[in-house]
């Protein structure tokens, strides 16, 4: 979703490969999104429903993209033998040290592997997104009546995410990002 359009990519998983079945977009005729936040929820819901009601989209789960400008990321190096709870606390502490609070941000992290030259450590990418942006997308998935399988950062790792095995057999990827 850009300020004036919604894009849909319908993918089908075939083994380890994702096959693109359909790529389409609809112009909205007005502003529906500004700085990653949905400004006209009803119009967006109607457009998304019309896209998802097309042939081939029945039963597809959603993967919604979060605009990169709504994300904050930090690369951290943590002890490899730390427990996931310890890593989570370290991620929260590091993000808090940069002024990112858990009250107004959703936080997550992704393990990236050992850093070069230090196999006893683990690199992680700590990511925080505005709760308003996340809640917008959760509400949109609920409004169109589709299960949400992920919220992926657009342009940062959406292509890599699409290559991974996390997608169900079929998924409709609604791009919620900035205008081209």
Regions inferred by a protein language model and the residue ranges of each:
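Hydrophobic beta-strand segments of well-ordered beta-sheets in folded domains
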Residues: 60-64
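N-terminal phosphate-binding loop and adjacent alpha-helix
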Residues: 23-54
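Small-residue (GG/TT-enriched) beta-loop-alpha framework at ligand/catalytic clefts
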Residues: 1-26, 56-58, 88-90, 115-180
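Short hydrophobic alpha-helical segments used for membrane anchoring or interfacial signaling
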Residues: 11, 65-66
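Internal amphipathic helical hairpin motif
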Residues: 25, 41, 66-124, 162
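Generic alpha-helical secondary structure
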Residues: 37, 41-45, 84-88, 130, ...
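Amphipathic alpha-helical regulatory segments at dimerization interfaces
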Residues: 47-54, 94-97, 140
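Conserved NTP-handling cores and scaffolds of large molecular machines
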Residues: 13, 52-55, 99-102
